UniProtKB/Swiss-Prot annotation:
Cross-referenced PANTHER family: 60S/50S RIBOSOMAL PROTEIN L6/L9, LARGE RIBOSOMAL SUBUNIT PROTEIN UL6
Protein name: Large ribosomal subunit protein uL6
Organism: Macaca fascicularis (Crab-eating macaque)
Residues in coiled coil: none
Function in brief: Component of the large ribosomal subunit. The ribosome is a large ribonucleoprotein complex responsible for the synthesis of proteins in the cell.
Pfam (any one): Ribosomal_L6
Lineage of the species this protein comes from: Eukaryota, Metazoa, Chordata, Craniata, Vertebrata
GO terms of biological process kind: cytoplasmic translation
C-alpha cells in the first residue's frame, strides 16, 4: 500500500541557522557548521514559518521502506543540531589484567598511539576522523575523551580505537584487555 503524503517536522532552536541547497542541509550553530547530503533519498525538504524555525520532510507516494527514511532524515538533522549546539563527547576506558596499556596523544589530539597492549612491542597508531579531538582525562586514570560536533565521526573514531585493541588468537572471554567506550554524552550540559 502506498501512502499519498507523509511528513515530519524538526524544530530548530533560536541559536541555530539551517540552510537548504537542494537536498543538502547545512546547519550553523555556536560550535561550528555541519553539512549533510541527502540527494540519494527521494524526499522533499522545506523550511517553514516566517523565521524558518522548522524543517519539514515530505515523501509522496511512499511504500513502507521509503516512509522510514523520513524519520531517519529527521534524526540525522536533530543530531546535527545537537552537535553544533552542545557537541558530542565519548569517554573510553582502558581495561587490562596484567600489562598496563600506555596511551599517548600526538599531533594536537588527532593521533592516538597505543603501546604495551598485552605486553606487545608493536605500537598501534589510530588517526582520528577530521573534526574529532582526543585527550587524556585528568580526573580519571586510564580514560580517553573524544570530542567533536559530528556524532558519526566521533563514534567512528571511538570504534577505530576499540578495533585497534582486538585480541588475536586468544580466547576473548578470558582476555578482556582493550579500550572500550564507557560513556556517551555531550560536551556542554543541556539546560533542562
Amino acid at each position: 500500500m502506498k501512502t499519498i503524503l507523509s511528513n515530519q517536522t524538526v524544530d530548530i532552536p533560536e541559536n541555530v541557522d539551517i540552510t537548504l541547497k537542494g537536498r543538502t542541509v547545512i546547519v550553523k550553530g555556536p560550535r561550528g557548521t555541519l553539512r549533510r547530503d541527502f540527494n540519494h533519498i527521494n524526499v522533499e525538504l522545506s523550511l517553514l514559518g516566517k523565521k524558518k524555525k522548522r524543517l519539514r520532510v515530505d515523501k509522496w507516494w511512499g511504500n513502507r521502506k521509503e516512509l522510514a527514511t523520513i524519520r531517519t532524515i529527521c534524526s540525522h538533522v536533530q543530531n546535527m543540531i545537537k552537535g553544533v549546539t552542545l557537541g558530542f563527547r565519548y569517554k573510553m576506558r582502558s581495561v587490562y589484567a596484567h600489562f598496563p596499556i600506555n596511551v599517548v596523544i600526538q599531533e594536537n589530539g588527532s593521533l592516538v598511539e597505543i603501546r604495551n597492549f598485552l605486553g606487545e612491542k608493536y605500537i598501534r597508531r589510530v588517526r582520528m576522523r577530521p573534526g574529532v579531538a582526543c585527550s587524556v582525562s585528568q580526573a580519571q586514570k586510564d580514560e580517553l575523551i573524544l570530542e567533536g560536533n559530528d556524532i558519526e565521526l566521533v563514534s567512528n573514531s571511538a570504534a577505530l580505537i576499540q578495533q585497534a585493541t582486538t585480541v588475536k588468537n586468544k580466547d576473548i572471554r578470558k582476555f578482556l584487555d582493550g579500550i572500550y567506550v564507557s560513556e556517551k554524552g555531550t560536551v556542554q550540559q543541556a539546560d533542562e
